[in-house]
Every structure is written in structure tokens, then in C-alpha cells.
């Protein structure tokens, strides 16, 4: 007969619970990300450009919008060439005022990203709130919100943003318009993009409110606001994150368009769109680098964010898993 040792009779140690990061790494979304070269490259581009924009005051060779650091003799210096008057060399060249294009892109990206992210957060907050109310309450409130959304959808987003921007500036005293320009721009872009969030959340809320867990919460007397925030909202956020990612690229392009038209951020705080507008005046005079490099930066940022949003849409779609 085989003897049983005390070690063999001891119960097995329970497995350690996996951390949240480990569970995410083993999820279908993480697996899709690891096997998607497009998503990896897009994430890398967005991360590098965002980090460079955030650290612009420390990594930019010059402060391109400080008059004390500008030298007109450096104007129109081609990329990687020595200026014949000052002997300075600029990686991406300079504009007519002697501003370093590389430094201007870093500072301009900060404004573009700040406006884009803030506008998306504003539009998402407004759209999700109205969509939850419309889908959960229903009745004439649902009809009113959706009819307003339908009317707004009949106009281009850029036109809505221009209209809101012009009306808002009319109520701001001239002395404060420059300081409030960025915030007015954020609200204008946000008000032009809230509809898609509201329609998506409303549709998902209509499905969720008829489920048993919502009906049970109603029966035990949970307030409607608490049901929407604690039970319905977490289950409708998946599509919202996808819309927000794609909407960030749209918000950045909208901001650049408005700034290119001269109705965006003030000249003292130029974005990528403002830099493109400055370079447009020298496009046919031989100084091609003034418009080329800001345009490439805007294209790379918007394209990377858009590709990341496309991947997220496919990764979160259960039908494609």
C-alpha cells in the first residue's frame, strides 16, 4: 500500500485573482489591438504627437510667438539651410516673421488638441445627457429633442459652428473677445456635433429601459435619475467611445477649417489651421515649407485618430468577433 504523506493531503492553494490590467490584456479588444498593425501605428502617432505638444515649452527650440525671440532677418529660411544673415539653421525652416516652423507646429498642435478634446467632451456630455432623457422619459420630450436633432442634421456641421461662433461673439465685449475666443470655439464645435451622441444613446436607452433589471429598479422605487446614471448609462457607453474617437478627428479638422477662415483662435495663440492660413499666402512665391509641414502635421494627426476610431468600432462590435 502506498503511504500518503502530509504534503499530499494538504488542500491546493487558491489561484491568485487576476488584476484588472491582466484581465484587459487577455480580452478580445486587447487581442484585436495586438494583431492590428494599423491600430498600433495610429496609437503610436497619436501618442507621440500628443506628448510632443504637451511638452512643447520644454522641447521646442524657440518660442515662435514671443516677439522678444523673433528676428526678421531669419525670415524665409529654407529647411535645414543656414540663414545668410544670422547663420542660424532651422529644421523645418521659418516663415516671413522668422518663426521656427517646427516650434510653431508643436505649439499649434497644443491648441488644436486642446480645442478638439474639449469640444468632444462638451458634445459628448450634452449629447449623452439629452439622449438618456429622450430615450428613458419618452413622450413629448423625446419628440422635441429628436426634432431639434433632425433639423440640425439638415445643415453642415461647419455651418452650425460658424453660426454659433458668430452669435456668441456678438454677446462678448470687444475687450474680452481674444481671451474668450478659444472657449467660444469649443462651444461652437461642441454644439455642432452633439446630435450623433444623442441619437445613438437614445436608441440604446430604448433597448435598455425595457430590460428586467431596469423594471426591477423601478418597482423597488429607485429614482429615475439614479436608474439612468447607475444602470442605463454604463451599458450604452460602448458606442459613445467610438463616436468620441472619430469625433475627435472631425473636431480637429473643424477647428483647423475655422482658423483657416480667420474665425478661430486669435493670432497670439495660433493652431495648425492658423499656420496653414499663414502659409497659404506664400504658396505660389516659392516658400512652400511654410504651408507644407503644418499641413502634414494636421493630416497625420487627423488620420491617425480616425484610423484608431475605425479600429475601435470594429473591435467593440460583437458581430465581428
Walk through the language-model features, giving the residues of each.
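Short, membrane-interfacial amphipathic segments enriched in basic
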Residues: 10-30, 87-102, 134-138, 225-229, ...
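Alpha-helical transmembrane segments of integral membrane proteins
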Residues: 97-321
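Short linear motifs in intrinsically disordered
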Residues: 21-22, 79-83, 249
